Design a protein with these regions (language model features):
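Conserved, single-site charged/polar hotspot
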Residues: 2-381
């Protein structure tokens, strides 16, 4: 299925089209070109169909690399799952590659990306994967994870942490035939494509080209979070496993509004989440980390008790963090007052921001949040 590719909804169709063309041209002219490691980033997973296209003429290839034809520039098509493979316009194959000509970009779902597109069938539907150079991937991730107006030293620290995390995932997923990592922030780094790039992200990524964090010659799990609320955590108090470089350290985020939060639950809301406990009568933090994050939360009802542990405390209740207190409101509600945003492991982004503003450089920031690590050039495989 073909249709003209108009991008956005806040402008008229004509204005939107030319606005996006100017953005694409600006990125193509300004962004520096570097080559290093290719990452496979799943943009759409397990879908029946996915919208694809190219900003320049797109070359369509099959699994053997044979060219099947071309997609016109700035037009989009639906790739659809069919028995035995994928259908795209007039072609049908086991899988499809879409490669832009020149310095073009690919379109997947609802965004523009660098690199090329692979559309492949899986047991759950179609998966659309962006094959992209790690530097170009990071141009986008950096703008998704941090405000590009932040100090360059904070952005450099984020660039190295994000590169390290991506290559850690690449190694961890080495037996996955389809992708290395995805693009959703609940599991991976924020990857929005070219829309989140800027000169500031180019500068931070390029100035740290090929640099990753290692511990005893192995790439580390360089997780990061928005803010911890004054102190990060030891990884074993959150995820159970122990890593010598993910140790609890003082944070520098206490002046950040986003790191202070309050959330109120009616008993009926908790009961709806955990119907097996019946009518909820109490929420009791039973075990704390040394830095007052809730490790075990007991939810008591008239039919039973539910025990949440570790990160399940935060994710099950959709809380910003696990560093909170519980009080009972006059109306019987449960009032949770907390500090921090995220799992409180590794680098605090707001902490990095404040440290950079005080003149601390990116290597000092990384050395503070990741204990005992070394800065190492990429050994690409």
């Amino acid at each position: 299925m073909k249709f003209q590719l108009y991008l956005g909804s806040l402008f008229s169709q004509i204005k939107v089209r030319y606005w996006w063309v100017s953005i694409l041209l600006w990125i193509a002219l300004v962004a520096p070109a570097q080559a290093s490691v290719i990452l496979r980033v799943a943009i759409e997973r397990g879908v029946n169909q996915v919208k694809v296209g190219s900003s320049t003429t797109g070359v369509v290839k099959d699994s053997t690399g044979r060219t099947l034809g071309q997609l016109p520039a700035m037009s989009a098509y639906y790739a659809q799952a069919v028995p035995g493979g994928v259908a795209l316009d007039k072609w049908q194959s086991g899988l499809f590659w879409i490669e832009p000509t020149g310095k073009g970009f690919v379109y997947i779902g609802d965004r523009w990306y660098r690199g090329r597109t692979l559309v492949v069938p899986t047991d759950k539907g179609l998966t659309a994967v962006n094959w992209v150079d790690d530097q170009e991937y990071l141009y986008s991730v950096l703008g998704g994870e941090m405000d590009s107006s932040w100090p360059q030293e904070a952005l450099k620290a984020q660039a190295i942490a994000a590169r390290t995390y991506a290559l850690y995932e690449r190694e961890r997923q080495r037996n996955n035939p389809v992708y290395d990592l995805g693009n959703t922030p609940d599991r991976w780094q924020i990857y929005k494509g070219v829309i989140s790039e800027s000169p500031a992200t180019y500068a931070a990524v390029d100035s740290t080209l090929g640099q990753v964090l290692t511990y005893k010659n192995r790439i580390i799990l360089s997780v990061f979070h928005a803010c911890s609320g004054g102190h990060t955590e030891n990884v074993e108090d959150v995820w159970g496993s122990k890593e010598p470089y993910l140790r609890a350290v003082q944070d520098y985020d206490q002046n950040i509004r986003e790191c202070n939060w309050v959330k109120t639950f009616l008993p009926s809301e908790i009961s709806a989440k955990f119907p097996e406990v019946g009518s909820v009568t109490a929420m009791i933090p039973e075990t704390y980390s040394p830095f007052r994050s809730v490790k075990v939360l007991k939810i008591v009802g008239n039919k039973g008790t539910k025990v949440l542990q570790g990160e399940d405390v935060r994710t099950a209740l959709k809380l910003k963090s696990t560093r909170f207190t519980v009080t009972k409101g006059a109306d019987g509600s449960f009032v949770l007052q907390g500090l921090g945003y995220g799992h409180a492991l590794g680098m605090s982004q707001w902490g990095a921001y404040n440290l950079a503003r005080q003149g601390v450089n990116h290597l000092q920031i990384l050395g503070h949040y990741y204990q005992g690590v070394a800065l190492t050039p990429i050994q690409a495989k």
